[in-house]
Amino acid sequence: NEYKSFDFSLGFVFTPAEEYLDLEFRKKMKENNRITYLGGKPEAIKLGIFNEFDFAIAIHSMGGEPTRRSIELNCNLAGFLYKYYTFLGKPAHAGFAPQAGINAYSISTLFNTALGLFRQQIDEKYMVRINPVILDAPMGTNVIPDKIKIGTDIRAHSVEYMLELSERLDTIAQCSAKALGGDVKIETEMGYLPFLQSHYLSNFVRETFKNFPEIEYCKENSPVSAAGDIG
C-alpha cells in the first residue's frame, strides 16, 4: 500500500503501427506529410504524446501454450535497420543471345551466397539476424532479367555493430554486381533502436508480483533478436 502515499497519476497509451510492415503504404503517407516516421511510437514521440510521462512500462503478451502462469523481466530486444539492394543488369533474349545480357538475378544469387559465407565472420554476442527477401523481380523465362530488388533487415543488440554490418553488406552487394558486370542501387532505412531494459525498475516489478500467488514463475535475462518500437 506504499504507493497510496505517492503523488502520481497513471495513464494508458495505445499506439498503432508497432510492426515494421506495410512500408510502401506508410511511405506514401510520409510523402503526403501525414506522418514523419514509419513506426507508431516514434511518431507518437514527435507528436508529444509522451511529454507528460516521467517513465513508461511496456507490457507485451506472448504466444504459445505455457504450462504455468508466468511473467518475464529484463528481456532485451534487438534494434534493426532496413536495406534495399536493387541489382541492375542488362536484358537480352535468353535463347538467342544470352551472352549479350547481364543477369540481375544471378547477381542477387551471388549476393545471397556471399552473405551466407560471410555469416561465419559475424560476432554472435550481438545476436545478429539477417533475412534477405526478393521484393521486386519483373522476369520472364525468355529474357535475361535486368532488375532484381532485394530487401533485408539487419538486427542486432548494438547500434554501432548494425552500422558496421550495413557497410559490410554494401560491400558484398557492390562486389557481387561488379563481378558479373552489373550495378547496384543501395538504400538504407533506420528501423528501431535496441531496447535495453532498466534492471532498476524491473526490481520493483518483481517485488510487486511476489504478492500475487497466481504468478508461479518469473523468467529473467533472456534477450531475443526480435525488435520493437519501444526501443
Regions found by a protein language model. Give the residues of each.
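Di-metal (Zn2+ and/or Mg2+/Mn2+) metal-binding site signature of metallo-dependent hydrolases
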Residues: 1
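Metal-dependent amide/peptide-bond hydrolase catalytic core
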Residues: 106-231
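Histidine/acidic-residue-rich, glycine-tolerant segments that coordinate divalent metal ions
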Residues: 6-129, 138-142, 227-230
